[in-house]
Amino acid sequence: MQRLRFSSFTWILLSLFGLISCRPEPPIEPVEPAEVAPLTDAEQVIADALDGMVVPISSTPFDITDTDLQVLDYLADTKIVGLGEATHGTREFFQMKHRVFQYLVEQHGFDAFLFEMDFAEAMLFDRWIQGEIEGDLRSMMRDEMLFWTWKTDAVEDLYTWMRDYNRANPDKRIHLYGVDTQSPNYSLKELLRRLELIMPTTADSVRFYIGSDYERMLDLYNSKDQIAADRIQNSLEEVRKVIEEAKNAIIRSSSEEAYAWIERLVTHMEQVEAHSYQYFVLGQGPLRDKYMADNTRWLSDQMPEGSQVALWAHNYHVSNTFTGNLFNDSQGGYLRQRYQDDYQIIGFGMNTGRFTAFNRGTLKTNTIPTVANRSSYNYLFSHMQNKNFILRFDQVTSSDADAWLRRAKPFLSLGAVYQAPASNYYYPIILTSMYDVLIYFDNTGSTLLIR
């Protein structure tokens, strides 16, 4: 299996964004929270009310029963369910997303898991899930995955479960798809692989026009090389012409569906270029979320009518954040605008514990020993009797609790990079505006990365 190759600068760049794989020490016992001040009387009333409305769950996601998850049965007919994560390195979040997806598949017939991973990168792993290729999954993840965030035992367990499910249910197969647009490497390789199978001469034409600049894009764009950018943009225009001119021949040699996927790979290459140019050359906000939403829509449309999918991404990406500003709107915001209530959002929260993230350039297990923000949602949740729970906001019947949830408050949110103090990572949001459901674990452990 050919490994993806990145230049030295690209590896440095990916490291800064927390994307290189290595392995922290294994998760250890839960963090012992430091003593914190009690709630006020008014806050205690809210905490008590919420305790009566949440579904208590185990701190171990795979011990959570189907009965516990019946609170999510209202999602039975939902087209897309977003599953967030408050950090990119929390084991309970990853395992819980597996558990929820398993429930949605087994109880409600969901068809696919869309991932915050490269569009074409996911195709390789879906072929493994479908049984089309063999090989050791752990080795594939170590060698072929770009982001360290997904190179975990929890994701390995999820993909293994999906493959096992397909073996047991060949007439109701589930799929893995990617929606992200950060790497120039995967889509070109996948485009050429597909063309080689049905139209080798068209593959040769793509190679002729694309040259070597496209795969070196991140290096060239980081150096603000406008001449190279012009070459890359022109080459992509030529590649699109080649594919469109070969459309009828591709369909005759294969199918309309095959052409649709080939054309979409070209679209994805264009997305990666536009996002990279906007971000690195122009220094403007990223276009990722807009494109991730568009890829989610396209993938959903490609599936049979009535298909349902879950979406794995960070809390921010799945959230309903839509202002009309291209650079501030989230993937979930675009999806809510398009699908309205047919897109439902499950956010994740935590109080204390360990998580994996880059800290001063080193990928390591980090610790939050106590809630840092007295006015945060997390602070009150940490004082509830039920330490781990599922809360549907549409089932909040207490007026005091409802009003409290609808007021903007800080909420802990980490990505792939962390540097203490934790108070730097609390952002004011309105929980009920951004999410429909909250899954909360009071004390968490870090992900276990694959070497």
What are these regions (language model features)?
Residues Q2-T10:
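Bacterial N-terminal signal peptides that target proteins for export
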Residues T10-L19:
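Bacterial N-terminal signal peptides
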Residues C22-R451:
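Structured catalytic-domain cores with a bias toward divalent-metal coordination
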